[in-house]
Amino acid sequence: MLSINTTRKENELSGNLGKMKITEENKPKKVLGEITNFQRSTQKTPLKQEIKPVVKKSQQVEPLLADNPRRFVVLPIQYHDIWKMYKKAEASFWTAEEVDLSKDMAHWESLKKEEKHFISHVLAFFAASDGIVNENLVERFSKEVQVTEARCFYGFQIAMENIHSEMYSLLIDTYIKDPQERDFLFNAIETMPCVKEKADWAMRWINDDSSSYAERVVAFAAVEGIFFSGSFASIFWLKKRGIMPGLTFSNELISRDEGLHCDFACLMFSHLVNKPSQERIHQIIDEAVKIEQVFLTEALPCRLIGMNCDLMRQYIEFVADRLLLELKCDKLYNKENPFDFMEHISLEGKTNFFEKRVGEYQKMGVMSGGNTGDSHAFTLDADF
């Protein structure tokens, strides 16, 4: 009887223990310690989550940079102003073979030593710089911008920059007969510190992952609008003397192209939602101005061809102010154009197409609005 009662009490006790809730007071110390250690370990080492690439907030809301599944198809046109720029560039196509250099050598031989030095070094800078512009277009802008119309322009700009680089290389190859000097000029980024400084500044923007697309658009507008301006002016200065017709004609074509590229950069900038502050834009432009001024007044002084260095410095600031206005910013220097001969050089030009195909040079019919016009229709009405 006693054993039966004892067994019954043991069963009741074990049943009650099974129903008991474990609290902090009655929890065994060993179990409590294990749970606490587990909680600490899970707090220290959270579960790994998939790491997603960081996208800047500014890029998330930029229509030009937003993912565009229709970027592979041209029509329908969404950005008519950008498309118009592309067609304008397309109409301005030319090739290096169209520039006659046959008369240049006689003039080259008559130049002074310092004039040859200046021209050859300017050409060396130009030959290298177009490749740097293309590096930016291929590696950055063409990958970032998702708007079809803009990608069309960038694609065509790449082709034209290649032609510019070919043209400058042909000029060096034509004028410079010494193989060592020629090699020195072709490798100007490595052999000429003044060219390297300009190249390094441009390359810095290509490799800068912290700067926004808007900042880099401004920087490369400065490359094509400021870094080239003084050198273009110096070659136009030679045109006043009626010498080097091949050099000066190619300079007109290339300066017109670069003017269009700079205008396109400003157009792209106008479409951006998130723009840098005016102070930041002024900073970028001023850096480019100072580098260009040193290049043409100290490292490679334009007085070598008879130009005034102070006026060249002023001209570079004038060009920078003009670019700032295009970017809808205040002027930074408030300078007038000191070179009256540059006032008569329009990037679109006034020369008759059939006389010399210079400024108004464009492929026939490209700007007429496509193949819908009657001027391109095939008829049998003509008199033979």
Curated annotation (Swiss-Prot):
Cystine pairs: none
GO MF entry, a single one: ribonucleoside-diphosphate reductase activity, thioredoxin disulfide as acceptor
EC number: 1.17.4.1
Membrane-spanning parts: none
Family affiliation: Belongs to the ribonucleoside diphosphate reductase small chain family.
Additional free-text comment from the UniProt record: There is no sign of synthesis of a corresponding large subunit after fertilization. The authors suspect that the unfertilized oocytes contain a stockpile of large subunits ready for combination with newly made small subunits.
Function: Provides the precursors necessary for DNA synthesis. Catalyzes the biosynthesis of deoxyribonucleotides from the corresponding ribonucleotides.
Official protein name in the record: Ribonucleoside-diphosphate reductase small chain
Species whose genome carries this gene: Spisula solidissima (Atlantic surf-clam)
